[in-house]
Amino acid sequence: MHALSLRLLKGNYGIMETLKFNELNISPEIFRGVKDMGFEEASPIQSKAIPIAMTGADIIGQAQTGTGKTAAFGIPVLEKVKKEIKHPQTLILCPTRELAVQAAEEIRKLAKYMHGVKVLPIYGGQDITKQIRALKGAQIIIG
C-alpha cells in the first residue's frame, strides 16, 4: 500500500512568485490549449499546485474565485489520462451543476489538442439513460 501525501495550499498568494506555463513541464498539447485560452503565466495557486499534483501527491488547495483553481487540478488530471483507455479514470466532484458544467468546459478547452480525451459532466435533472450511454468512452467524469 502506498502512503498518501497530503499538502495544504492556503494563504495570501499576492506576493508569491509565479511561473510561466512553459516552466511547468506540461505536455505540448495542453500547453497549446492554455495558450489558446490566452494564458502565459500561471496564477499563484497554479504555480504552487500543478508541480505537486503532477508528482501524484494528493493536495487540498484553497484560493479565491477566478484564480484558476480548475486549471490547477485540471492540468495534472489531463497529464495523467491515458487516451487509449476508454473508461472513467478520474472523478471530479463539484458542489453545484453550474460548477460541474463550468469545470467540464474549462478542462475541455485545456484538452483541445488531446485527441481521444472525453470529458463528461453528469448531474441531476437529466435523462439518466442518456447519461449512462454518454459515459461510454469518457475518461474524466465531472459531477
PLM-predicted stretches and their roles:
Residues 63-67:
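The conserved Walker
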Residues 11-14:
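Residue-identity detector for glycine
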Residues 32, 86-143:
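Conserved nucleic-acid-binding Ia/Ib motif block in the N-terminal RecA-like helicase ATPase lobe
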Residues 46, 57, 69, 89, ...:
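Short, cationic motifs built from Arg/Lys/His that form the positively charged side of catalytic pockets
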